[in-house]
Amino acid sequence: MALLDFFLSRNKNTAHVAKERLQIIVAEQRKFKSEPDYLPQLKREILSVICKYVNIDPHMVTIQLEQKNEDISVLELNIILPD
């Protein structure tokens, strides 16, 4: 019986780990789907305007849209400017 219990308990642990991983993947996908359709284009246009006036690496600019509640969204723009 101990051998059978060993294999059965291991399957439950494996299933639990797989379930947690799947929940993480689904949460990440929901995060990206919650963005409006226009956001990628908006990010590109903002980046092009910044690069027009300041010579920076595009990787030094981060743009995020945060949903604070049902009525409020915040567009956060972080730029690391050269010296």
Curated annotation (Swiss-Prot):
Q: Which GO terms describe its biological process?
A: cell division; regulation of division septum assembly
- The answer to whether keyword Flavoprotein applies is no
Sorted alphabetically, which keywords does the UniProt record give?
Cell cycle, Cell division
InterPro entries cross-referenced by the UniProt entry: MinE, MinE_sf
Q: Where are the transmembrane segments?
A: none
- Residue ranges the record marks as coiled coil: none
Top-rank lineage group of the source organism: Bacteria
Q: What function is annotated for this protein? A: Prevents the cell division inhibition by proteins MinC and MinD at internal division sites while permitting inhibition at polar sites. This ensures cell division at the proper site by restricting the formation of a division septum at the midpoint of the long axis of the cell.
Recorded family membership? Belongs to the MinE family.
List the NCBIfam families: minE, PRK00296.1
Name by which UniProt lists this protein: Cell division topological specificity factor
Species source reads Buchnera aphidicola subsp. Schizaphis graminum (strain Sg)
Recorded name of the encoding gene: minE
